Amino acid sequence: MKKLLLFIFLIPAMLCSAQIDKDQLALAINKADEANTEQLKSFIWKRKADVYVENVLKLTTITEFSFNQAGELETKIIDSESSEKKKGGIRGMVQENAAEDKMDYVGKALDLSLAYTYMTKGQLIDFFGKAAVTEKDGIIEATAENVYVEGDKLTVRVEAATNLFLSKKFSSLLGKDPVDGEVKYEKFSSGVNHGSTTLLNMPAQKMRIDAINQDYSQRVQ
């Protein structure tokens, strides 16, 4: 009987020891992410984003990415191409205004995805503090709600051996429009981790964005 009671009292302690220390995990992942970003700062790359409306390709944009001397990520659209035929006269002006509105919307959607892709130390700690965390088969998975705005949700998958991101899935809002997104990561042969693809769905606009990061090149020292 005494042994049974002792075992019962030990159960909570055993469960607590098995739990993941989320604060330490957040710090470890942030440390790995910061070290990886330092290596990524030596690269310049481009993002090709194809914009579909009702499953029809309407727009393609090319954006260049680089880090400035302050360590901040900078973006610059270097090319855009619309698949719609240009109209003349007043219709052409209306079409041009609509195209500008679409470009603005697409830009805001892609900026939203970057907010989930590149998180600060404080944001990561806050996220893991409220997240449900599990680990299985060498992969850490964490899910939390109300990350940036009320009602949003983010799930991250992290390689336990390196503490580097494998993917991020989120649902959020762009204005009042719902947005679902997924960012996937890959590694160079050197081990540097980087965002490879981004998929965004905006059902209110019947819009989908397929983006791929490409043409990575290291700066000349």
Stretches found by the model and what they are:
Residues 16-46:
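N-terminal leader/targeting segments and the immediate start of mature chains
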Residues 64-66, 126-135, 156, 185-187:
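Short, exposed beta-strand/loop patches in secreted or surface proteins that constitute
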Residues 1-4:
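Positively charged n-region of N-terminal signal peptides that target proteins for export
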Residues 9-17:
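Hydrophobic h-region of N-terminal signal peptides that target proteins for export
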Residues 40-42, 60, 128, 137, ...:
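Extracytoplasmic
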Residues 36-86:
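Solvent-exposed N-terminal domain segments of exported/luminal and surface proteins
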Residues 20-21, 81-152, 172-174:
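Flexible, processing/modification-adjacent segments and terminal tails
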Residues 137-221:
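Gly/Pro-enriched, hydrophobic low-complexity segments
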